[in-house]
């Protein structure tokens, strides 16, 4: 692909704005700012030990998880990049207990940005792919946001995406009109369109789950995974392979490219906590992307994007990916009720 004929993220968004007329200028600018912040995060991730950013920060986030230095740095990069542009009313992050209103000395816009600044951060120190996940909502209260403003079901998202910081740095985006992937050209500093209208195969022979928790699973998940593990001689009549990176962005990106099902179920260890992944800035944006690519995403009993949030850091079980497999494991949950 010659440099002259490449489609950059900026060009793609401008063309989408012109052709479909469903991408407001403020939303286009917001997406570009988020993508620019992801470039800065990618740069800091790639420096590794040379950047003195590895290891823990000696603090915990609101979930009680030990924060890595890069967790905090990535969060600050996203806040600093987005607070002054006039596109947002407020932001919320995995790393902050409450939402972040745009300071009074900056203009405010009509959108809300929710993000996990560095997903899979347990992999930072061992050089495994990690990433950033984000979701964009309209602020129902105009430009004056409250925590309640964020508590919208995923069906209200106007954009969602993620970046993967791996062998290549990629930026995957949906604005409700398909899913497209952009690769960072480090020589010129641009996001370049490399995959258009991504589609997840409806059937798959791969699944992603943390099998070390098998003894804690509820019966529907155990039944489903046991059938997969039984292979060609089992009820499915086929051999399946398990893949688990322990980085949601990396696992979902693989599924987006070649199919599969990603599962992070609730289990018996914490019956009062329905799952581990956060609805607002992990499950919802990934569900939006997966559905736009022809896949499905449920909690096991309900479409993820139809869950009514009750808090910024609410957790849900997650089953997403190839449509036929997600529908099968969801059916097993309904049968057990």
From Swiss-Prot:
Main enzyme class: hydrolase
Molecular function GO terms recorded: fructose 1,6-bisphosphate 1-phosphatase activity; magnesium ion binding
Keyword Metal-binding: yes
GO CC entries: cytosol
Catalysed reaction equations from the record: beta-D-fructose 1,6-bisphosphate + H2O = beta-D-fructose 6-phosphate + phosphate
Alphabetical UniProt keywords: Carbohydrate metabolism, Cytoplasm, Hydrolase, Magnesium, Metal-binding
Annotated localization: Cytoplasm
Major subcellular location class: cytoplasm
Necessary cofactors: Mg(2+)
Binding positions (Mg(2+) 2): 116, 119, 282
Keyword Transcription: no
Family statement: Belongs to the FBPase class 1 family.
Subunit structure, interactors included: Homotetramer.
Protein known as: Fructose-1,6-bisphosphatase class 1
Species the sequence originates in: Burkholderia multivorans (strain ATCC 17616 / 249)
Gene: fbp
């Amino acid at each position: 692909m010659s440099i002259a004929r490449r489609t950059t993220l900026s060009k793609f968004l401008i063309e989408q704005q012109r052709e479909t007329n469903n991408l407001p200028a403020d939303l286009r600018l917001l997406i570009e700012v988020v993508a620019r912040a992801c470039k800065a995060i990618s740069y800091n991730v790639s420096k590794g030990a040379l950047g003195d950013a590895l290891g823990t920060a000696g603090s915990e986030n609101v979930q009680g998880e030990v924060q890595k230095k890069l967790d905090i740095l990535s969060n600050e990069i996203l806040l600093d990049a987005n607070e002054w542009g006039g596109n947002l009313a407020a932001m919320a992050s995995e790393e902050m207990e409450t939402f972040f209103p745009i300071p009074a000395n900056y203009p405010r816009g009509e959108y809300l940005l929710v993000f996990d600044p560095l997903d899979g951060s347990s992999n930072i120190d061992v050089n495994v792919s990690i990433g950033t996940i984000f979701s964009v909502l309209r602020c129902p209260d105009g430009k004056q946001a409250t925590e309640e403003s964020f508590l919208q079901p995923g069906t209200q998202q106007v954009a969602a995406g993620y970046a993967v910081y791996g062998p290549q740095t990629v930026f995957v985006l949906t604005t409700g009109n398909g899913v497209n992937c952009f690769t960072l050209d480090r020589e010129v500093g641009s996001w370049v369109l490399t995959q258009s209208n991504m589609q997840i195969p409806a059937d798959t022979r791969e699944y992603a789950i943390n099998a070390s928790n098998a003894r804690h699973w509820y019966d529907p998940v155990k039944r489903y995974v046991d059938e997969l593990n039984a292979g060609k001689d089992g009820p499915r009549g086929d051999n399946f392979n398990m893949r688990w990176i322990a980085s949601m962005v990396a696992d979902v990106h693989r599924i987006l490219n070649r199919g599969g099902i990603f599962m992070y179920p609730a289990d018996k260890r914490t019956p009062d906590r329905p799952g581990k992944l956060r609805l607002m800035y992990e499950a919802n944006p990934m569900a939006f992307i997966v559905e736009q690519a022809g896949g499905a995403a449920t909690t096991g009993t309900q479409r993820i994007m139809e869950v009514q949030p009750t808090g910024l850091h609410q957790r849900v079980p997650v089953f997403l990916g190839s449509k036929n497999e997600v529908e099968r494991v969801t059916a097993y949950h309904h049968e057990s009720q």
